[in-house]
Design a protein with these regions (language model features):
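Internal maturation/activation junctions in enzymes
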Residues: 251-326, 340
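Extended C-terminal subregions enriched in glycine
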Residues: 276, 280-282, 317, 362, ...
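Active-site rim segments in enzyme catalytic domains, especially the processed small/beta chain
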Residues: 34, 46-53, 61-63, 70, ...
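Conserved catalytic alpha/beta cores of large enzymes that bind or transform nucleotide phosphates
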Residues: 352-428
Length: 486
């Protein structure tokens, strides 16, 4: 059950305790939830470089006190000159990093404090050093990839669990961004260092590619959901897949005994349209999902990528942010920019075929898909890592929050997030061993693959919102995510 607090001003749920603390500190320093979300995202870039970094992207939904919702797309395009070969790692997998311009855009459009105030906690952590987390240090299998792409001298490579990890280069570039904004990153010496790193390892990114980058702010894709609206990230995000599946559920009379099976089938049917996510949302939402609940269809749409980090923040003024930051795969492309202290994304690995085929100056369909639910004066932001698992996890949580005819049941938020989950992947149905519907789903023909309860493959939901003027937050027990209301 969501806990009640006396006149709280701020609520945050994030992928790391230091990020949650930074978000709340910024609000208590006079900022709003947007300033706080930037602070949390920046801290994650410092303490979780396997998941996110300055070489990656940000997607976020912002709900304003007047109840309007806008979407920020902070992702970049592939180079204007295509590489000789498109690979899933190395320089040719890198698209223009979008997160820094995303911060600058969000701060200028919705924030209250200077960007420097939001970046201060991350700079402090990077400058003073932070104990290496078990999560980072345990990724020994990534060391060979990193070493092959110039990271042998990166301080992280020699850091053991619990030891101090020094990041002066990262602190310096963050300090420059705090002082000079996007120009400190997309021009000059920093831009040249990014270009040099990608080209040394087979990429074709240019200074012009970086200079011409800009974030996009647009309306979200919205559908009716119970007595309110569900908002998802617009293209190039695959959030439309969530909207398509959710819309089918709202328009279908489903027997409660069939609901979990129906969720799986709706997810898999919607994922057949993933590569067309860039088409007009009205056209996508008018597509008929081919769903036959008589038997499992085993459609192989969702894939097995995992990483990313979530940030959800709300304040007592009515600002709510639901966001995700990512370098895509663990440590992205594995290409280190040594002068700046971060690795670059491998978002070009998201290209597939057809509308989403690899090409120059294009944004691949993007896995980051935060969501926002609006019902009257209540707003709820939801986000989770897990690539193609994101929309599946959010759909399951939403379904558990709005069963029956009682509308949104915020009292069930913690339980809805904590309950065992499944994940459709490559024609199989991965499922937590304590899921109550495991046997029923098997009988219906799903190819069950049981995983241990709490396996990180099932995501790590962060949630924050406001109701009746009071902010609240919730978080899953998976992957060490944290929440705090203050």
């Amino acid at each position: 059950m969501v806990k009640k607090f006396q006149q709280p001003r701020a609520a945050a749920a994030t992928a790391h305790p230091a990020a949650t603390d930074a978000a709340l500190r910024v609000i208590y320093s006079g900022g709003n939830a947007v300033d706080a979300a930037i602070a949390a995202q920046a801290v994650i870039c410092v303490v979780m470089p396997d998941a996110a970094g300055l070489g990656g992207d940000v997607m976020q939904l912002v709900r304003m006190p007047d109840h309007r919702v806008e979407a920020l797309t902070g992702s970049g395009r592939s180079p204007a000159v295509a590489p000789d070969r498109w690979l899933s790692q190395g320089g040719s997998s890198v698209t223009v990093p979008g997160i820094v311009d995303g911060w600058c855009t969000a701060s200028a459009r919705w924030g209250r404090l200077p960007l420097a105030a939001s970046l201060a906690p991350a700079i402090e952590i990077a400058r003073a050093s932070r104990a290496s987390s078990q999560l980072i240090a345990a990724r020994d299998e990534q060391r060979a990839r990193l070493a092959a792409h110039g990271a042998s001298g990166w301080s992280l490579m020699s850091t053991q669990p619990g030891h101090w990890w020094h990041q002066p280069e990262l602190a310096d570039i963050l300090t420059s961004i705090a002082a000079d904004g996007r120009e400190a990153f997309y021009a000059g010496a920093a831009a040249q260092a990014i270009v040099d790193a990608t080209r040394h390892y087979g990429g074709s990114l240019s200074l012009d590619d970086l200079a011409q980058h800009s974030s996009e702010v647009a309306d979200p894709v919205s559908i009716d959901w119970q007595d309110g609206a569900l908002h998802v990230q617009p293209a190039p995000s695959q959030g439309i897949v969530l909207a398509m599946a959710a819309q089918w559920l709202t328009r279908s009379a489903i027997d409660p005994a069939d609901r979990e099976h129906a969720l799986v089938e709706a997810t898999e049917a919607a994922f057949q349209f993933r590569d067309f996510a860039g088409r007009p949302p009205g056209r996508m939402l008018s597509e008929a999902l081919e769903i036959d609940l008589s038997v499992a269809q085993h459609r192989a749409g969702p894939r097995g990528y995992l990483h990313t980090a979530g940030v959800a923040v709300a304040d007592s003024e009515g600002w709510v942010v639901s966001s995700l930051v990512s370098v895509f795969d663990d440590f992205g492309s594995a290409v280190l920019v040594p002068e700046l202290g971060f690795v670059l994304n491998n978002r070009a690995a998201g290209f597939t075929s057809g509308d989403n085929a690899p090409r120059a100056s294009a944004r691949p369909v993007h896995t980051l898909a935060p969501a926002m639910l609006s019902v009257g004066d209540t707003a709820l932001g939801l986000a989770t890592p897990g690539a193609d698992g994101q929309v599946q996890t959010i759909l399951q949580v939403l379904s558990r929050l709005t069963t029956g005819t009682e509308g949104l049941q915020l009292a069930e938020l913690d339980d809805a997030i904590a309950r065992p989950r499944w994940r459709s992947q490559d024609g199989r149905l991965l499922i937590e061993g304590d899921h109550p519907d495991q046997l029923d789903l098997s009988v219906r023909g799903h190819r069950i693959e049981t995983r241990r309860p709490g396996d990180p493959i099932f995501g790590a939901v962060v949630a924050a919102g406001t109701t009746g003027g009071a902010p609240f937050a919730a978080a899953a027990h998976r992957r060490g995510v944290t929440k705090e209301v203050r």
